[in-house]
Amino acid sequence: MKSTFKLSLAALLVSSAMAANAGIAIVDNEEGNFSVGGNVELNFNYQDRESNENGDAEFNQDGRVLIEFAGEKYTTSGHYVGVKAQPLFESTGNVALDDAYFEFGKKDSWAIKAGRFEAYDMFPVGLDVFLEYSGDTSNELYTGDSAYVYQMKEARGRGSDGQLMYNQSFGNLYLEIGTMIGDRSDLFSDTYHGTAVDHDNAKDSFLVRPVVAYNMGDFTVAASVETNLISDAIVDVNGKDISDRTGYGLTGNWNHGSWNVNANFAYLDAVDETNASVGLNALYNNFGLGYVYGANEYDSTWAQGDVKVNTGYASYEFQNVLEVEDFSILLGTYYTTVENKTNNVSAFSEDDDFGARVRLYYEF
């Protein structure tokens, strides 16, 4: 009976939030707050990918509904505790989770956060309604036979195991130290440079990711490094430590009037390969345009030479459609190519991919 009541109450709160334009504040006073909100995102996709085995164009629809429960409690000394949970209800029928964390600290000063969340974005891509690559992005699996567009995300967060972060602001200076602990063997697929990954003997990793950011009016710059401190956390079947990976990142943002511009650089020093990525994107009013370049250099018996990935993308947002506040229709497209200059011609497919998307988005 108690469970039924809780579910009914949650359904009532969600219904109330959707009836409002921008969520509902259940409690909001000097002692704390509790709110329910979320958003709906549905995509209608077209893709023409040379990597598709039968060569046919693809049409599909995907999306999800995110419900956010967030609350904070304050003290007279300026300290607080907070909690946030964001369950995802996917159009496939699966139920997933975005953020789920607990934090405490002092307002406008320091905070400690534990759970599941994302740390500072060191490779922002702007308005990316539809953005994919001929290869992998670094918050997905590292696939041995694909190019790797590294983006300083291997220790950013939202992993399946533990995560802890400390951050503090000193005026215009922001400091952050993020960590991820636990099994990170899911970063790799079955092989690394043609050799099978020994998933059965993986150890728990300990990844650290410090960030320093400084704001100068319209400009913000940030630098970061991420690395795994545990030796032999992930090895191949020959015993080679493939978890020995250190990444470096630098990003800058200019935000003035209707303009928002990001410039990004990321570099990964991994076992028998290096990965460098450069990104530039701009948002003017509701129009976004971006470009990402990735260069992989291999030096092993499996492959020697370079693989390069070029990706361009564009987006546009129609806001407040039908005069409904926070209801948007977004258009997005991307085009990506890969060029294999290694001595292993069969290792990397030179595929060109194109995609277009219409997105329906409503924030409640």
Outline where the language-model segments fall.
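Gram-negative bacterial Sec-dependent N-terminal signal peptides
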Residues: M1-I24
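Outer membrane beta-barrel
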Residues: I24-N45, D56-R184, A213-G217
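Residues that define the transmembrane beta-barrel architecture of outer-membrane proteins
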Residues: G32, G55-V65, V95-A100, R158-G162, ...
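Transmembrane beta-barrel strands of outer-membrane/channel proteins
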Residues: G38-Y46, V83-P87, R116, I177-I181, ...
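Repeated loop/turn-to-beta-strand initiation elements of outer-membrane beta-barrel proteins
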Residues: G78-V81, D108-I112, N172-I177, D218-A223, ...
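Solvent-exposed loop/turn segments connecting transmembrane beta-strands
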Residues: F89-V95, M122-G126, E154-G162, D183, ...
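Detector for outer-membrane/organellar transmembrane beta-barrel domains
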Residues: K203-S205, R209-E317
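Outer-membrane beta-barrel "beta-signal"
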Residues: F318, D352-F364
